[in-house]
Amino acid sequence: MSQLKLNPYFGEYGGMYVPQILVPALKQLENAFVEAQADESFQAEFTDLLKNYAGRPTALTLTRNLSPNPMVKIYLKREDLLHGGAHKTNQVLGQALLAKRMGKKEIIAETGAGQHGVATALACALLGLKCKVYMGAKDVARQSPNVFRMRLMGAEVIPVTSGSATLKDACNEAMRDWSGSYEKAHYLLGTAAGPHPFPTIVREFQRMIGEETKKQMLEREGRLPDAVIACVGGGSNAIGMFADFIDETSVELIGVEPAGKGIDTHMHGAPLKHGKTGIFFGMKAPLMQDSEGQIEESYSISAGLDFPSVGPQHAHLNAIGRARYESATDDEALEAFQLLARSEGIIPALESAHALAYALRLAKECTKETILVVNLSGRGDKDIFTVSDILNGKEE
């Protein structure tokens, strides 16, 4: 069996824990990715799509009224301004181009909040690929605008009713489909998790977030920020922000997991800090598990963070102490969501509001001149009905 070209592990995390039938597909994908990364024409086409279709580079906005502390500047990396409404579009364009390069005709994807599904649908429409999106039935119900968008762009949306009918079940169904169709289909995984080479591919196709941020900060402030802060579900927006700063040891990397109703309630999605290592979704990673080792249901107000595991590179960055991982509750995220809307006229995704909530908490504690950058990973249009129901007392 031919050897892998890239290291499938990040410390002890990662790997390729899949049925034997999928190993050739993953190796083929790794080969194609390595070749594409070295191919100037592929890179030129990807860069052109990011610039002229998706709208990169995205703005770095200094908030005027948000910071609770006059010594703290809070910048927002505006992935919410990207075509499609979230950071998801970046790596989806990269993977869809890669699929075309490999001669695949079909794309299979999973989605939670629907943002990855929308990004996949728009990339498939643009590049002439057939698109199937698996989505937990619960998420189909709570994200109807995104379901309509996907269907409008020609995607087939398949509700998944098994298990908890959320993202992890959609992941399982998508992987199952791919097992039988990989010769003609590419599985376009939506986060920096899953079996090798996906965590590496997704990081590389998201790393422009941090690269642009670094360049923009040096232009604006003449120095790097003290910390970059991003929400963590599977972890793609965060690893995209962190990747270019990992070697910049003066910059603190802070990931924010969803604490849901509170860590002590078990109604949360914070496996990095409160899970145990296990095998899930083709990788070795921290997992929410019960006392018998069964996967526990994760919970978050934001569908995109409602995931019982996390990408292996985040697990490694946590283990070696290079990044730290905090959490924010539903209530804190809701408060930050409203505060940003009222103070800056920007409505963030509920996912991004978790990162914002922690940034506000951190800003209050700072005792010297500090610059924080929050990755505003997506816009909040998709969440306005959820939030209005909660604020009007229609949900617990």
Curated annotation (Swiss-Prot):
EC number: 4.2.1.20
Keyword Magnesium in annotation: no
Similarity comment: family membership: Belongs to the TrpB family.
GO MF term set: tryptophan synthase activity
Cofactor(s) needed by this chain: pyridoxal 5'-phosphate
Protein name listed in UniProt: Tryptophan synthase beta chain
Lineage: Bacteria, Pseudomonadati, Pseudomonadota, Gammaproteobacteria, Alteromonadales
Summary of subunit composition and partner proteins: Tetramer of two alpha and two beta chains.
Broad class of enzyme this protein falls into: lyase
GO CC list: cytoplasm
CDD domains, sorted: Trp-synth_B
InterPro entries (UniProt xref): Trp_synth_b_CS, Trp_synth_beta, Trp_synth_beta/beta-like, TrpB-like_PALP, TrpB-like_PALP_sf
SUPFAM superfamilies reported in the protein's UniProt record: Tryptophan synthase beta subunit-like PLP-dependent enzymes
N6-(pyridoxal phosphate)lysine carried by residues: 88
Annotated keywords: Amino-acid biosynthesis, Aromatic amino acid biosynthesis, Lyase, Pyridoxal phosphate, Tryptophan biosynthesis
Catalytic activities: (1S,2R)-1-C-(indol-3-yl)glycerol 3-phosphate + L-serine = D-glyceraldehyde 3-phosphate + L-tryptophan + H2O
